[in-house]
Amino acid sequence: MAIKQLSETLINQIAAGEVIERPASAAKELIENALDAGATRIEIATAGGGKTLLRVTDNGLGMSPADLELAIRRHCTSKLDGSLADIRTLGFRGEALPSIGSVARLSITTRTAEAREGATITITGGRSDPVRPSAAVVGTVVEVRELFFATPARLKFMKSERAETAAISEVVRRMAIAFPKVRFVLSGSDRSALEFPATGDDRLARMAQVLGRDFRDNAIEIDAEREGARLTGFAGVPTFNRGNSLQQYAFVNGRPVQDKLIMSAIRAAYAETVPQGRYPVAVLSLTIDPALVDVNVHPAKSDVRFRDPGLIRGLIIGAIREALMREGDRAATTGAQGLMRAFRPEFHRGDQQRPQEPWTAATSPYRPFSPGGAARGFAETPQAAFSDFAQPSARNAAVPVDSIQAADGQAASFPLGAARAQLHENYIVAQTDDGLVIVDQHAAHERLVFETMRTALHARPVPAQALLIPEIVDLPEEDCDRLVAHAGEFTRLGLAIERFGPAAIAVRETPAMLGEMDAAGLVRQLADELAEWDTADGLAGRLEYLAATMACHGSVRSGRRLRTEEMNALLRRMEATPGSGQCNHGRPTYIELKLADIERLFGRS
């Protein structure tokens, strides 16, 4: 078959297949055009999930009749000046309008501030009519009807109207977060109305509009700079997480992106604080020299490529971790409110029912404290009491619930108070000056062990204890190969292993601070994790995560009875340890109930 030149209409339809995948793609391109035109108000109207109707109205600069005629031609744009190395606009290819016009019925009405009348042009399946004068206000109205009518095969791959409408809503949300100075309105016949009034420079207020007040109440500000790259935004506290990554938003020079490098850096930053299978909530904006980032790597401009990806990854991980450390033990207020609602009874008096007042951030059962700041007298706390956690437990030890020594009265003034009892051999009940604290002993000790190991990692190899008889662990050969390849790194953590035949590993030393532990279970888990890391980020940046795994295996278990001095030692260590308000998996280690809250539970005024 002879080679021949494709028609302009067919070329545009091919381009539409890359740029306009679905109605949401068309909405994104049209909203970007409006933003590039300086619009401060953008209204989007849809019908039939955007397939029947998609209209975008803005109050931007508008176009002259001559520019309008050029705008529907392929690769005609006002946003490039001969170089792809300095792109400062959202759009730049000049493909969106001709691509949409080739597969739909497109109408554009526009007017500039200097013009006395507007101009309109229509394109149907790639064929355009002449520009004609029309009545119009300053700005542009782009109306798309019967999207993909010229390529009916594409309609077979469209999702339901509800799904397509949801995709358009997500586009509007992302744009609204990126541009808080712009008012966005989305309306439709299928209850898809959204309205985001402009918030000026208050980015957190816009995020509250889009993500809800819960995010505002549980957000930590991010602001860091490294080698000319600046990262700003907000990230949720670890206990404010979701079951998917849909509420992770990233912007590069104002452009919404879904970049794998950025998303993996967010995961790495929360690796030791968010449970596996859960995802943190974050809105991050990266400002960088346009010459150091390539936005021309994907037709939809949703992916970018950085000249120095290591710099960007390090900046994101470091900035988030520093912010989390700065916030100390802050936990999600929503988790506290849900917990209280779960066991707070309805109050009845005769036929009257008095609803309980909702919890606020100020009355949340989670109370952050400054690590070390309030732990007066920790240096005098008997270290032997806490060191008992690393020793075998006497299951029959008595649970202290009787008298509390006079010294405990002073301990009640500490942030976590004085231990009064142990419930179900797992929860420590402590009394404070104005309420009580319930501590999960396993989660708390797990965090303390991890922090000890992490500190030791940066100073020297973790002290190890030799096993009298090496423990032999049978594993597949490929798992053995991975473990032996990283034996030197395990040694830094106090775990000494060596090959024992083709399909077994001998464990000769374990970390001394963990006492007796399930060495075989630990080795098997490490083998599983290594199998995943070898295809991901590598092991070098995950030593702390290994320390968290070891801490989980070696911390005091649920079901162990503790003496009063052991419980108080644990409380004092928690007060002196940064990040002790949550375990390595992101779960809270304690909750606090104010005396006033307890009285409210019983209907006392």
Curated annotation (Swiss-Prot):
GO biological process: mismatch repair
InterPro entries: DNA_mismatch_repair_CS (IPR014762), DNA_mismatch_repair_MutL (IPR020667), DNA_mismatch_S5_2-like (IPR013507), HATPase_C_sf (IPR036890), MutL/Mlh/PMS (IPR002099), MutL/Mlh/Pms-like (IPR038973), MutL_C (IPR014790), MutL_C_dimsub (IPR042120)
GO CC, any one term: mismatch repair complex
SMART domains the UniProt entry points to: DNA_mis_repair, MutL_C
Recorded superkingdom: Bacteria
Role according to the record: This protein is involved in the repair of mismatches in DNA. It is required for dam-dependent methyl-directed DNA mismatch repair. May act as a 'molecular matchmaker', a protein that promotes the formation of a stable complex between two or more DNA-binding proteins in an ATP-dependent manner without itself being part of a final effector complex.
Protein name per the record: DNA mismatch repair protein MutL
Lineage: Bacteria, Pseudomonadati, Pseudomonadota, Alphaproteobacteria, Hyphomicrobiales
